[in-house]
A protein has these predicted regions:
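Active-site-adjacent betaalpha module
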Residues: 1-7, 34-39, 63-186
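Metal-dependent catalytic neighborhoods of phosphoester/phosphodiester hydrolases
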Residues: 55-59
């Protein structure tokens, strides 16, 4: 079996995206990040930064997440984000900005385990972009959510299953059993 080089990508768990619909994933992600860091695996956080005149503002009329405290990673993950390999600031949906793509090339990740907010937007775009670059992308369904509620989250999971494969959308518990079946441990 080929050796794997995994990375955990935590997408946009920021104050401006954490609502009553998405807050439940914060402790799940916190525990997951702690475990990955303890095992010495790479962890990357992303942080979305909107700006004046962005397509989100001009086309969609959406002008949130421009400044603190909205853009800040939630308090529960602040210290952990400082221990991560990187926090990639982005003005687009995906991790794969110039910086994010360079990190992926430089570290040669074979498997990208993605969680965060919003499942149907930035999480989905990141797993699809990883897949299209030949990285085995995994969407962690119970460590991802939509700030708009369950229907958009479920829609994001469904679209991901069509785009990267049903078997690539797993729970954290399935990740743990997957980890025992594949080495090195993830």
């Amino acid at each position: 079996m080929a050796e794997i080089n995994p990375v955990l990508v935590v997408v946009d768990v920021q104050n401006g995206f954490v609502t009553e619909h998405s807050r439940h994933v914060v402790p799940v992600i916190e525990q997951l990040v702690r475990e990955w860091l303890e095992k010495g695996h790479d962890v990357v956080f992303t942080r979305y930064l909107n700006y004046h005149g962005s397509p989100f503002e001009k086309i969609m009329g959406w002008s949130k997440l421009k400044e603190s405290p909205e853009i800040d990673i939630v308090d529960e993950l602040q210290e952990l984000s400082k221990q991560a390999l990187a926090v990639v600031d982005k003005k687009v949906y995906t991790l794969f900005t110039e910086e994010g793509a360079e990190l992926a090339r430089e570290h040669g990740w074979t498997d990208m385990f993605v969680c965060g907010i919003d499942t149907e937007v930035c999480v989905l775009k990141t797993v699809v972009d990883a897949f299209e670059r030949g990285v085995r992308a995994w969407l962690l369904t119970d460590a991802s959510a939509s700030h708009s509620g369950e229907p958009p989250h479920s829609a994001g999971v469904l679209v991901a299953q069509k785009m990267i494969g049903r078997q690539q959308t797993i729970s954290v518990a399935e990740l743990e059993s997957h980890s025992r079946a594949r080495k090195p441990e993830v």
